[in-house]
Curated annotation (Swiss-Prot):
Catalyzes the NADPH-dependent rearrangement and reduction of 1-deoxy-D-xylulose-5-phosphate (DXP) to 2-C-methyl-D-erythritol 4-phosphate (MEP). This is 1-deoxy-D-xylulose 5-phosphate reductoisomerase. It is an enzyme of class 1 (oxidoreductase). 1-deoxy-D-xylulose 5-phosphate binds at K126, S152, E153, S179, H202, S215, N220, K221, E224. It comes from Burkholderia mallei (strain ATCC 23344). It catalyses: 2-C-methyl-D-erythritol 4-phosphate + NADP(+) = 1-deoxy-D-xylulose 5-phosphate + NADPH + H(+). The keyword Acyltransferase does not apply. Mn(2+) binds at D151, E153, E224. NADPH binds at T11, G12, S13, I14, R38, N39, N125, E127, G208. Pathway: Isoprenoid biosynthesis; isopentenyl diphosphate biosynthesis via DXP pathway; isopentenyl diphosphate from 1-deoxy-D-xylulose 5-phosphate: step 1/6. GO terms for biological process: isopentenyl diphosphate biosynthetic process, methylerythritol 4-phosphate pathway involved in terpenoid biosynthetic process. Its EC number is 1.1.1.267. It comes from the Bacteria.
Amino acid sequence: MQKRLTLLGSTGSIGDSTLDVVARHPERFAVHALTAHRNGEKLVAQCLRFAPDVAVVGDAETAARVEAQLRAAGSRTQVAYGKQALVDVSKSDGCDTVVAAIVGAAGLAPSLAAARAGKRILLANKEALVMSGAIFMDAVRDHGAILLPVDSEHNAIFQCMPRDAAEHGGIAKIIVTASGGPFRTREPATLASVTPDEACKHPNWVMGRKISVDSATMMNKGLEVIEAHWLFGLPSEHIDVLIHPQSVIHSLVSYRDGSVLAQLGNPDMRTPIAHALAFPERVDAGVAQLDLAQIATLTFEKPDYARFPCLALAIDALEAGGVASAALNAANEIAVDAFLSRRIRFTAIAQTVGAVLDGLSNRTPGGLDDVIEADAAARRAATAFIGKLPAPGVERAA
């Protein structure tokens, strides 16, 4: 039976990869809705190729422009805009599968709406779990939704875990791999001077700018540890991070009997996307087969928490519980945006997040409103902290 998809964040890198897989299997997948923030030109091109029922953008001006171009091309795709429109296409009867690929906190509400509508959710938006893990997982369970991880690491863990939850007691730990990003071997003393372009040059993966910076700080790996905790129900002491520069082993599961299962593949997001789209079947993803003889060498090392303080901050937030993870994510989004805008140094990202967490009044969220309130408070605190920092290249007077 053909699956009907709502693709949240279709113009980003995950969206591109998802549509590439969809195009290879038109007999299996059809598109109900595509969404973008402001990249109207790309969204129009996608709509003309995949003919969704609905296209959603962030604002009225972009919506008017997209609708005019679609009508001129003879397209019948309806155009909507705004946060509620994202929620509407996520819970629509017109789709059975929602690919949640909006970057950041903006993806929380539509992802949660999909869970409450009992959809099959392909989760690439890790912030939904980082911000509101218990609330989100309760919604998945209570409404009979199916949650399939798309992040390469969590998809790898999912593939290596037993399907029967009763057998999860045999797991000793899960090991989340990380490339180490572009600054794995760079002298820590020079990190303050790195540029946004340098931070966005990932050695193995093609990603958007925000997640590329998160990879460079290893905040991305910290967020993935938090996500793994909620997805697989393991405490932080049973989740390890391992640097693996080649990005061939995407993660591992270690069992109590000494067995270790790993998922390997070329670093291409179409592999985990295809796995989740077709699960429990397998389909061609357009990815070349892995040639281990050509790679020849796989190496591993422990993470350097002094070099990557954001990783330590994320693990601390997980262990603190409450709204700490939501505050961590919010502060990081503000700090990364400031870095990409060249308003702060690369090293100030961790400084900002640390300062916000130090000033946090932590509490257990009673519901989504508490999470949203903590997110907003952390954004205000991060913005205030950044406002007191010297601009890059400007030092405070002695």
